[in-house]
Amino acid sequence: MRTFALTAGLLLVPLLVSAQVDTAVAGARLPQEVAREVAALFNATTTLRATDRTVIPAGRDVPGDVAVLNGPLIIEGHVAGRVLAINADVLLRPGARIDGDLLVVGGEVEGREHATIGGELRIYRPALRHVMEGERMRVSAEEPRAPEDWWRRFERRRRANTNRLEIANAGVYNRVEGLPVRIGPVLYRDQGWGHLRFAANAIVRTGSSFSSSTPDVGHTVGGELRVGRRYGVTLGGRLYDQVEGVETWQLSNAEVGLASFFFSRDYRDYFGRHGGQLFAALRATENADLTVSYADERWRSREARDPPALFNNGRAWRVNPELDAGRFHVANLTVRVDTRNDTFNPWAGWYLLADYERGTGVIDRAGPVSPGVRAVPSGSTRYQRVFLDLRRYNRISPSSALNVRGVLGGWVSGDPLPLERRLSIDGPGTVPGFDFRSAGDNDVGTCASSSAPAGRPAQCERIALAQLEYRSDLRISLSDRRAGARRTRFRVDGAWIFFADAGRGWLVNAPGNPLNIGRHDFPALSTYRTDLGGGLDFGVVGIYAAKALSVSREPLNVFLRVRHRF
């Protein structure tokens, strides 16, 4: 057990670098009163405004207030009034002096120990969302939508302050369902002290609902009661017959759907879930929540269909592996902590997802596995599994960041894990220098020890992954001069990336298998898959190249990611 704990600690050492301690407020959203204060100060006629990199050199005295948007702001001299930095970092050089307050929104402050700040220092890590109307700033009223929102179709909402009605939305395009479309009402009622929500949807699958002799239509019916506004308790339950991905942690829904629709490359495996679930959630702080759930459901395999793809349509889809079929009772305890300054473009803060799962049930039909991975299940099955995803985002200069991530997960005790709960280190979401589901014996990515079943499913009982990423701002602009004035005709903001990854999977309940490691041990670090890579990230999409280091014969891989790698 000591070896297991020691090696786990070594993998997570980079994540435990302490964050800079400051007078700061972290959270997913900027308080509205602060947003209004920022806009008022920026729009004041007496404020000296700038919207790009700004330097106040040594020896210069600025008599009033200063506001900088985007920045960074570098102060070497003296500001007699207040200083406001919006979505910008502030760098204070030795001898810098600010007589008034220093307010930073969506940024960090460096060098304060060498400078003098006469007023109050406040740092709010969430970025300010705003619209510029000429030279005036207006605070945006709506929060940004999640990247999957582009899937929504045929949506109608009644804008009264007590009800909302959604007619339909779509899920993730995949090789098993095609496009799953949820049709039905979602009713929402705001009660002041909280809210009530009820949804009843039929799931129509374009790949199977209209082509099979037996209509393949799923459903989700559920409701929840929330007590509290920003903080509070949520109680709910649902009934469902739906298709679920085996490993949803590696790539986002948007990435999986786009890769499937455009290139007929589906990076997930799927199984059917039919049953019900009860859950309770507690949100006690701005940055953390706790969820407890219990489900009674039946699992079954699903066959891959032949949905259309825009490109490479002549290439056959990868077989969807046959997984374990049976009835299971599954209990989960999930903790989520998120202090990132921004959900979609973070450069400061922590993110933690920790999940403990206990399952009991009977496997009626066992899915095929590689020789020696497990004995054929018989009788009841009981297992315990954990999954930990820990990330740290660090701004190390006004224009660069060093981000690290560690993932540990897998079997804890009991019987061997069902195939639906097994894991892998494979593909562009983990160690992208290696091809997804590539063939080979003693594969530490999927734990196929020799011949693999059709579709090459994930068979690992434990995994470990470490990712390191260096990001630096990149600004590309084309401009010209007319009548003595410089005009920008084209501008793209992004970042260039260097990254390194290391990870592998292994077995713990397969004596005699070359991929089996003791239950209390960790694999030797020399056996891990490793790679190096780089790329350009333009916020919405990034293009990268990665080369495997641990296996030199692997070719260079070029791939796209939607938003950031992690």
Where are these regions (language model features)?
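C-terminal outer-membrane beta-barrel translocator/porin domains of Gram-negative envelope proteins
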Residues: Y231-F279, A309-A500, W506-V508, V558, ...
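Solvent-exposed coil/turn segments that connect beta secondary-structure elements
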Residues: G71, A88, G95, G107-E108, ...
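Positively charged n-region of N-terminal signal peptides that target proteins for export
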Residues: M1-F4
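Outer-membrane beta-barrel initiation region
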Residues: V21, V25-L30, V34-A44, T51, ...
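Transmembrane beta-strand segments that form the barrel wall of outer-membrane beta-barrel proteins
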Residues: N163-Y173, G194-F210, P215-G223, G237, ...
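Outer-membrane beta-barrel "beta-signal"
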Residues: L333-V335, G533-G534, F538-V540, E554-F566
